[in-house]
């Protein structure tokens, strides 16, 4: 019954809600829009069911199995249910045991944050307690120190300067980590007399991270320069509205990009898988799980639905499996599951009016995804990503070529089939970008080829303009090279935006990165200003002129110059020259970041105080010299302790005044401070701490001012990214090693290419054999290709598809001449593989992909079928191959079809015999003689005494039909002669066609 239908996700996962102390979860109906709720008078953010504790999985692609995470909080995973262990066991302490203030503070922190591993700063180390410490010790290969009195206080620790490196290693195990820092200085407490001298140091949670949200935030105090940022996957929220209806919102924390979509899928979830393959998420949050009917169930019905055995349960369970497993196949780290949310936050506290109005225009299921992501990201201080609506776009497949997941995998566009890296892929061939933001834009271009002829021509003209060896092009290339791969302007700008939410985040942004960002923006604007006359006088392509005009308009403001005047370029340029060395202390960078001649009175005041204390210390040294009658005496520094008076042991020590305080010493010397020197040194430390705070406050104000110009900086970055991509395509098009030509675009559906070459294979091996492609809509739109195994059939059809993609990206293609029409989709069924994770056999996978192709057909589709029907018996396989091919031939949509087969009998059915002229299916159009047969060329070589001939592959396409020569290929593979002879005898008396 529909009312008792089990929700998709809940069949496999149970998610327990952990309630925070003193807070009740606000319960609202999911049907109420979070954006309408935002206009209510109650501005507080209500508590909702948390996504944790949740099970986290790791997927091993080589074995297609699910492994339980090493997180000690998670129990073993059963087949149909995941029980999540309580994350912190309550340990009963003996009543006689008295807790120290630090232990009480640690217990309080652990109880307030039970869903995280806490790294707690204690002095100059970070400590992890309890069972979490055992997990971290294994992860970092450090010592685990067990407590004899209470397991809660067992711990492991590491130095504070290792925080960034160790944090990354812990996050890679798929857990959520919180960083707790000391929020006050002991010296400030002492001098300002804040509290008692023995009071506990204040500690606060300053950052929460997962692998998908960590952006090198904690490297600032690690004593190293900014490392290269690992490219993060998207954080994706999917709302499963009904069995085949989905809404999706994805955010990229590193760039601020937001993508949304709502779509209808089928039983194979091909649409969902295509989006996930493009997004490559690092974290997924699942909502909904089962459709509107589940909303009408009361709690009892929902809880008991898994026990129902009414009709359709097995089918539903199969579909539910594929929904969840679609994520488990593509997400290597965290899959977070929630049932239908019962409460939605009031987003008015997070989003501004413009953002709220924008999101109200979206469909309600998309709004729910936005609301849940805002709630989820609040803990990571990333929720204000949704305030920049300029970064929001729709995953719109109607404006670009459709490349389903199966197509991208078969053509190896982004990852190869051997080891899932980019080596040997189309993207690796095209990627000559010089900047990270340019590379990301090129990924978007490759995955979304254009279908508008005018826009493709515009891109070709821009590539042609940038292909000349002009002075302008050389300077532009050097500018992008100067920015380089290690400076991600887009990422730095969005980090500045995040920092405006929480003050503590401002201290996690590298000042050198800020300076280099401004310097590169200044260089870019100076570059276009320098060539302004050239740009305006040149007859540039519309696209290139539009991009350069945008940059010229931005260059006419003094925004970047004003910010550069506020900082100290002489110091920072010296730092930049030592960019790959740990040159100067973080504190020195803070103090010398600003140009103190332009204001900053509080910083100048503290610097003056420090200078005054230093003068007093020198005066005190003069007094000590007179006292000890040592005119050559100077301060020494030992073990990090400065301003020490060093005296040889013996009578000299005994004669010192009684108020001299011994700091350290050796067997021969002792080191002291007088009472006044100790006091002055303490005052110096105090003013240095205050100076540090004043610098942070000034920097935070500076970042807020920068963020107010986020759109301005983003405009520069986006235009530079377009130039970077165009230069990358120009580099491919101007390849010196091989001929590349600009194809002529045709309104007709035609593929006419002379001496075409496979763009990837020609770079991997020598002696590549070029082939002509001559496919015309009205004469031979269906090619049935036979020929020997390993003869190059698959490579040929892949070459056709790749050349079309390159054409519609705007890149020259490897051939001598080409005329190509515009395609709106490339649909491929290729390869023989099962999918154990989804419970599909090889043949089931094959048929589902064929079904998807038929559903997505358009009059401008290119369809590639590789050996349809080989996953089942010969008779059924042959019959299905014939029926599917006939459907594609007779369909009124009339796509171009390339069909590889070893069923040579298909040719007699499709070519020599006319189809039934009386076919009554209104979707079929019979009678067109458009099916042509081809085979991959070869030569037979017969040696005396051989039972069957050997073959030599020629790799050229020839008209006609050919056998498969499987026995010859088996011989090449090294099968024993006895086996080959037996196979030959069997084949001579058996005809499987």
Curated annotation (Swiss-Prot):
GO biological process, one term: mitotic recombination
Subunit relationships: Heterodimer consisting of MSH2-MSH3 (MutS beta). Forms a ternary complex with MutL alpha (MLH1-PMS1).
Protein residues bound to ATP: 787-794
Function: Component of the post-replicative DNA mismatch repair system (MMR). Heterodimerizes with MSH2 to form MutS beta, which binds to DNA mismatches thereby initiating DNA repair. MSH3 provides substrate-binding and substrate specificity to the complex. When bound, the MutS beta heterodimer bends the DNA helix and shields approximately 20 base pairs. Acts mainly to repair insertion-deletion loops (IDLs) from 2 to 13 nucleotides in size, but can also repair base-base and single insertion-deletion mismatches that occur during replication.
Bias kind Low complexity: ranges: 292-311
Major localisation: nucleus
InterPro entries according to UniProt: DNA_mismatch_repair_MutS-lik_N, DNA_mismatch_repair_MutS/MSH, DNA_mismatch_repair_MutS_C, DNA_mismatch_repair_MutS_core, DNA_mismatch_repair_MutS_N, DNA_mismatch_repair_MutS_sf, DNA_mmatch_repair_MutS_con_dom, MutS
Protein name: DNA mismatch repair protein MSH3
Record carries keyword Nucleus: yes
Species assigned in the record: Lodderomyces elongisporus (strain ATCC 11503 / CBS 2605 / JCM 1781 / NBRC 1676 / NRRL YB-4239)
PANTHER family: DNA MISMATCH REPAIR PROTEIN MSH3, DNA MISMATCH REPAIR PROTEIN MUTS FAMILY MEMBER
Keywords, alphabetical: ATP-binding, DNA damage, DNA repair, DNA-binding, Nucleotide-binding, Nucleus
Chain residue ranges for the region called Disordered: 1-50, 290-317
């Amino acid at each position: 019954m529909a009312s008792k239908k089990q929700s998709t996700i809940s069949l496999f996962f149970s998610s327990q809600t952990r309630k925070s102390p003193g807070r009740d979860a606000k319960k609202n109906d999911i049907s109420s829009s979070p954006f309408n709720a935002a206009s209510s008078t109650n501005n507080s953010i209500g508590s909702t069911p948390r996504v944790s504790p949740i099970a986290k999985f790791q997927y091993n692609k080589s074995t297609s199995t699910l492994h339980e995470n090493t997180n000690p909080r998670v129990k073993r995973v059963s087949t149909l249910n995941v029980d999540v262990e309580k994350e912190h066991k309550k340990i009963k302490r003996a009543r006689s045991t008295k807790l120290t203030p630090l232990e009480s503070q640690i217990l309080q922190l652990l109880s307030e944050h039970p869903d995280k591993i806490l790294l707690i700063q204690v002095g100059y180390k970070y400590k992890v307690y309890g069972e979490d410490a055992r997990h971290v010790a294994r992860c970092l290969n450090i010592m685990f120190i067990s407590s004899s009195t209470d397991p809660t206080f067992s711990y492991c620790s590491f130095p504070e300067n290792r925080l960034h490196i160790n944090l990354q290693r812990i996050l890679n195990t798929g857990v959520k980590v919180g960083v707790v820092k000391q929020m006050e200085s002991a010296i400030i407490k002492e001098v300002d007399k804040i509290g008692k001298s023995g009071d506990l140091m204040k500690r606060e949670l300053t950052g929460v991270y997962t692998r998908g949200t960590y952006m090198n935030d904690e490297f600032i105090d690690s004593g190293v320069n900014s490392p290269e940022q690992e490219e993060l996957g998207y954080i994706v929220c999917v709302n499963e509205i009904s069995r085949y209806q989905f809404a999706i919102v994805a955010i990229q924390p590193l760039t601020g990009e937001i993508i949304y979509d709502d779509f209808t899928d089928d039983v194979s979830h091909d649409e969902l898988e295509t989006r996930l393959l493009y997004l490559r998420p690092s974290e997924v949050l699942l909502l909904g799980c089962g459709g509107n009917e589940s909303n009408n169930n009361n709690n009892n019905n929902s809880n008991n639905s898994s026990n129902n055995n009414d009709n359709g349960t097995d089918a539903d369970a199969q579909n539910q499996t594929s929904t969840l497993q679609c994520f488990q196949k593509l997400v290597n780290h965290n899959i977070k599951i929630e049932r239908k949310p019962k409460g939605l936050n009031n987003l008015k506290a997070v989003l501004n009016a413009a953002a709220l109005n924008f999101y109200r225009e979206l469909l309600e299921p998309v709004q729910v995804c936005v609301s849940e992501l805002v709630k989820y990201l609040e803990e990571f201080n990333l929720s204000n990503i949704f305030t920049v609506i300029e970064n929001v776009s729709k995953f719109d497949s109607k404006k670009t070529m459709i490349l389903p997941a199966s197509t991208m995998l078969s053509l190896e566009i982004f990852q190869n089939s051997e080891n899932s890296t980019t080596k040997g892929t189309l993207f690796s061939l095209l990627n000559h970008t010089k900047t990270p933001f340019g590379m990301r834009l090129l990924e978007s271009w490759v995955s979304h080829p254009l279908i508008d002829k005018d826009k493709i021509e515009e891109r070709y003209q821009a590539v042609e303009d940038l292909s000349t060896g002009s002075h302008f092009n050389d300077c532009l290339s050097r500018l992008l090279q100067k920015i380089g791969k290690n400076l991600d302007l887009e990422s730095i700008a969005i980090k500045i935006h995040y920092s405006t939410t929480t003050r503590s985040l401002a201290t996690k942004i590298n000042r050198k990165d800020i300076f280099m960002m401004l310097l590169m923006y200044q260089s870019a604007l100076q570059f276009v200003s320098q060539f302004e006359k050239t740009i305006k006088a040149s007859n540039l392509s519309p696209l290139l002129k539009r991009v350069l005009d945008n940059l010229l308009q931005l260059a006419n403001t003094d925004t970047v110059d004003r910010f550069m005047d506020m900082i100290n370029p002489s110091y920072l340029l010296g730092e930049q020259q030592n960019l790959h060395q740990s040159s100067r202390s973080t504190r020195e960078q803070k103090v010398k970041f600003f140009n103190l001649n332009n204001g900053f009175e509080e910083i100048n005041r503290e610097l003056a105080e420090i200078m005054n204390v230093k003068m007093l210390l020198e005066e005190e040294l003069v007094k000590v010299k007179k006292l000890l009658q040592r005119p050559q005496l100077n301060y020494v520094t030992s073990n990090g302790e400065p301003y020490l008076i060093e005296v040889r042991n013996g009578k000299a020590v005994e004669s010192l005044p009684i108020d001299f305080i011994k700091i350290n010493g050796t067997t021969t010397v002792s080191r002291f401070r007088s009472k006044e020197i100790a006091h002055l040194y303490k005052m110096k430390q105090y003013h240095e701490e205050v100076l540090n705070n004043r610098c942070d406050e000034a920097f935070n104000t500076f970042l807020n001012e920068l963020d107010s110009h986020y759109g301005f900086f983003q405009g520069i970055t986006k235009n530079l990214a377009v130039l970077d991509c165009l230069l990358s395509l120009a580099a491919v098009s101007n390849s010196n090693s091989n001929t590349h030509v600009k194809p002529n675009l045709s309104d007709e559906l035609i593929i006419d290419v002379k001496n075409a070459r496979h763009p990837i294979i020609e770079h991997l091996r020598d002696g590549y054999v070029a082939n002509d492609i001559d496919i015309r809509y009205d004469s031979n739109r269906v090619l049935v290709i036979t020929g020997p195994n390993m003869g190059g059939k698959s490579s040929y059809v892949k070459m056709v598809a790749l050349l079309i993609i390159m054409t519609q990206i705007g890149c020259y293609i490897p051939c001598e001449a080409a005329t190509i029409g515009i395609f709106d989709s490339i649909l491929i069924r290729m390869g023989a593989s099962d999918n154990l994770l989804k419970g599909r056999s090889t043949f089931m996978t094959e048929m589902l992909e064929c079904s998807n192709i038929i559903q997505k057909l358009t009059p401008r589709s290119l369809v590639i079928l590789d050996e349809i029907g080989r996953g089942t018996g010969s008779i059924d396989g042959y019959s299905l191959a014939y029926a599917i091919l006939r459907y594609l031939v007779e369909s009124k949509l009339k796509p171009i079809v390339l069909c590889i087969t070893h069923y040579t009998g298909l040719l007699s059915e499709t070519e020599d015999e006319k189809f039934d002229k009386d076919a009554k299916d209104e979707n079929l159009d019979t009678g067109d003689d458009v099916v042509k047969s081809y085979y991959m060329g070869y030569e037979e070589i017969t040696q005396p005494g051989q039972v069957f001939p050997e073959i030599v592959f020629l790799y050229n396409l020839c008209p006609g039909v050919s056998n498969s020569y499987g026995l010859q290929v088996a011989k090449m593979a090294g099968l024993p002669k006895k086996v080959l002879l037996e196979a030959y005898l069997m084949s001579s008396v058996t005809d499987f066609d």
